[in-house]
């Protein structure tokens, strides 16, 4: 079959998509980029070691089979990490198995501005950040055609910078000749000051106005700096009028940034404003599991659940706690457990700040204990693997909280208070004769006491 590797791969994707889950396809398969055909080997690039390992172990046979269906030829496949590509792949584009010289311009300066770990592939999507992620991806796919400017805001450590870098990586991946500049507002200000001091205003303006994409992190810090705001106002106008993409991040929406000039505030609101909220329990667990996978750490599920229930508002602190526990385990030569996690994190999680047991907390702990989602408790599912843990959770809510029966029922998908009574009585009676249930309830109660 005489076709470009990218054309072949596009057809393969249609086959592979039908044989994988949506999550697997979006997470692993879509991260692959075909680069060439060398003899009987189809060369594919992937973003990192983790992706390479997963694809090699789980999806090689499926990819080979899809290639054979599309081309009627049997190819081997080879995965290469994009950041470690041999030099020839940066200058060669193989078509119909013939090497044809091409010219791919990759700016080392632009790439150096971006953290290689901050990509869309490594970003964990949850309800708290889904909108901001979708907006960022739309901008990365079609710069200056989707939302301009894109303004992302949220608290410290929630993923704003990750999305900013991911946008930059994605744009450069799709168009290596694109001029992308990522900078913090502090650096922008310092460069402006130096340009004034050294009489290099022309060079400064050229750097920031003759580009295709400008990403400025923590834009709120230009507020109150008159000269910086003046310069950025004209930079913004120059880029916007030239149909260039602008992406800004802040810890608050434009209308809440004090001492920000109204003319800038209005421009920041021209495009799309997307917020990132603190992650919910499921997202916190997903973040920890992804971190453990990337770092190749073997962390018990209950330990990650402990971290996720204790640290709620900051992803960096969440990941930092995981690494702290691993380091503590290594230094003390103890196995990783919930008890070890409590000891390792006692300095950053005050025992005096133990929070009140709530219905939400009980749902989080019990659902995790039984490898379910909180949404399962609120669903209409009645299979034993869901119904029985739901009854245990209702029992604990009745026993450990002051909530009324109707309120408990409401929090479990709008169930009637009689359902809660039935669950409480059933678990109470079974506890008298079922030793394994007694152990489970005691374990759950202990975990809740440790919150």
UniProtKB/Swiss-Prot annotation:
The keyword Nucleotide-binding applies. It comes from the Bacteria. CDD domains: AAA (cd00009), Bac_DnaA_C (cd06571). Residues 1-73 are annotated as: Domain I, interacts with DnaA modulators. ATP binds at residues 157, 159-161. Disulfide bonds: none annotated. GO terms for cellular component: cytoplasm; plasma membrane. Residues 113-329 are annotated as: Domain III, AAA+ region. PROSITE patterns: DNAA. Oligomerizes as a right-handed, spiral filament on DNA at oriC. NCBIfam families: DnaA (TIGR00362), PRK14086.1 (NF010686). This is Chromosomal replication initiator protein DnaA. The lineage of its organism: Bacteria, Bacillati, Bacillota, Clostridia, Eubacteriales. The gene is dnaA.
């Amino acid at each position: 079959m005489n076709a470009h590797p990218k054309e072949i791969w596009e057809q393969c994707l249609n086959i592979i998509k039908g044989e994988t889950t949506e999550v697997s396809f979006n997470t692993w398969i879509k991260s692959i980029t075909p680069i060439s055909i060398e003899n009987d080997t189809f060369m594919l690039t992937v973003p990192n070691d983790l992706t390479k390992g997963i694809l090699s172990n789980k999806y090689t046979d499926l990819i080979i089979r899809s290639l054979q269906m599309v081309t009627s030829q049997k190819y081997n496949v080879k995965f290469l990490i994009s950041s470690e590509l041999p030099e020839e792949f940066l200058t060669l584009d193989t078509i119909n198995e013939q090497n044809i010289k091409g010219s791919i311009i990759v700016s080392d300066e632009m790439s150096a501005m971006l953290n290689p770990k901050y990509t869309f592939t490594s970003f964990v999507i949850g309800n708290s950040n889904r909108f901001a992620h979708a907006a960022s991806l739309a901008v990365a796919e079609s710069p200056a055609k989707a939302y301009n400017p894109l303004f992302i805001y949220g608290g410290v450590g929630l993923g704003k910078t990750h999305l900013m870098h991911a946008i930059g990586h994605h744009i450069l991946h799709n168009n290596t000749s694109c001029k992308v500049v990522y900078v913090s507002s502090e650096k922008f200000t310092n460069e402006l000051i130096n340009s004034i001091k050294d009489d290099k205003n022309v060079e400064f303006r050229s750097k920031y106005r003759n580009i295709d994409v400008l990403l400025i992190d923590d834009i709120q810090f230009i507020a109150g700096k008159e000269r910086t705001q003046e310069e950025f106002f004209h930079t913004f106008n120059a880029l916007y009028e030239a149909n260039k993409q602008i992406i800004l991040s802040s810890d608050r929406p434009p209308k809440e940034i004090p001492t920000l000039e109204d003319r800038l505030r209005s421009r920041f609101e021209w495009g799309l404003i997307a917020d990132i909220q603190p992650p919910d329990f499921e997202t916190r667990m997903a973040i920890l599991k992804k971190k453990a996978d990337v770092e190749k750490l073997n962390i018990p599920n209950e330990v990650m659940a402990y971290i996720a229930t204790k640290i709620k508002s900051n992803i960096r602190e969440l990941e930092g706690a995981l690494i702290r526990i691993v380091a503590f385990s290594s230094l003390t030569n103890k196995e990783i457990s919930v008890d070890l996690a409590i000891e390792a994190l006692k300095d950053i999680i005050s025992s005096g700040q133990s929070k009140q047991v709530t219905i939400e907390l009980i749902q989080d702990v019990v659902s995790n204990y039984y490898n379910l989602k909180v949404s399962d408790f609120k669903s209409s599912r009645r299979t034993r693997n869901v119904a029985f843990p739901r009854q245990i959770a209702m029992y604990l809510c009745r026993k450990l909280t002051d909530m009324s029966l109707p309120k408990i029922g409401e929090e479990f998908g709008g169930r009637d208070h009689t359902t809660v009574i039935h669950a409480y009585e059933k678990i109470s009676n079974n506890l008298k004769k079922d030793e394994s249930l007694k152990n489970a309830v005691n374990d759950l109660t202990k975990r809740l006491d440790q919150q």
